[in-house]
Amino acid sequence: MKIYELAKEVNPYVVEMRRYFHEHPELSNQEDRTIERIGQELAGMGIEYEVVPHGGIVAILEGKTPGKGKTVLLRADCDALPVQETKENLAGPRVCCSKVDGVMHACGHDGHTAMLLGAAKILKEHLDEVHGRIILFFERAEENGGGIPQMLAYMDEKGLKPDTVWGIHLYAGLESGKMGLLDGGTMASVFGFNVTIHGKGGHGSRPDQANSPIDCFVAIYNALEAARLTKITPFQPLTVSVGLLQAGAVGNVIPNDLTFAGTARFYDRDLVGMPFRNYFFQMVEGIAAAYGCTVSYNSITEPAFAVSNDPECAAFARKVIGEELGNDVIAFPEPWMASESFSQLQKLWPGVFALLGINNPEKGTGAAHHNEYFDLDEDVFKLGVAGAVTYALRFLDGDVDTSSRQWKGSVRDLFTELGVKPEVIDSYYKAIHE
């Protein structure tokens, strides 16, 4: 079976699907039209599927023979972002544009979904080569993490336990035609915060009679910056940023309140994420008290897991994909400090998250993710399709045993580890029956 040749043959279909999804982007938790179209495409291939309410779509391909009894999960995300797309990318006019004002696929999820549909098409047409089971996993709301809980609850209820998971992200930080297959940390974990400082407002001429939340925030911000040097091990990366700041309306009035929000990114949850989280609360509340202020937490995203490739699975992927596509395709980029809900899949089941380069200056596809100039190099889709199919088929036939490295607890235990309250966990399981 010449997988790369099959990927080339299916590439026009993948491009067509990508352009459809790009022209009709939908925000997180609103991907109804997208999910409907994915279902239509799967049905047209003769693949049965189930729509997971608030989660996405799960389909199962049973091979002609059970082989070694293994299961591989292939995943794609499908939501867009609230970004106003430009008519041109970095080099000139785009091949397709969003038809939805203020919404665009600015992170490549349109390509991810299209590539998984292409892989599904090949696998369905060659079930005699599938010696085991393959799960197709189309996830809603990756950008805000709103789809993965319901998808995992569904997997739990159905007793679906893959031996390995595969995901891929189109990546502007890597040149087109290269596929990053790293051992260990590939994308970062995130701790998110949205906090309001409550002070005492007053006239701008008498700051001595006010407790300015702005002064309080300045001290908090400086402490956040210093944390990287004084509170966290210097041998692990940490980035901290504040992207939202709201306070006051005019220059001569000290406001009562100030709201700030941001994120911290890291690779090691235990050595960096949890220590930073604990320091954050102590520091914010301590400084607020010193400035005569109080704080309220509008939202807190507890430290998640990093995307971390299982070394044995990653080495296997490099070997088999190198054999299929050529070793010159394999690359070792620096880990990416962005975050991904795929980390939860990897925490349960060892696997690989590949970074597929799309940076092509001639085509103008090098803009950063979540940027209005972001665009995809469609020529690389065949590599992504071939990579997914190759990993799946060769893993089913191979000797990689991940049983000792799988999550030892339940899916509910995983949610608990992430700081999710029991009643919220229950809501995930209820949601999939709505």
Language-model segments: which ranges?
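Acidic/His- and Gly-rich active-site-bordering loop/insert found
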Residues: 1-105, 110, 114-131
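Short Gly/Pro-enriched turn/cap motifs at secondary-structure boundaries
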Residues: 49-50, 142, 183-188, 334-336, ...
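Histidine/acidic-residue-rich, glycine-tolerant segments that coordinate divalent metal ions
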Residues: 81-83, 94-104, 110-111, 123-255, ...
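Metal-dependent amide/peptide-bond hydrolase catalytic core
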Residues: 218-434
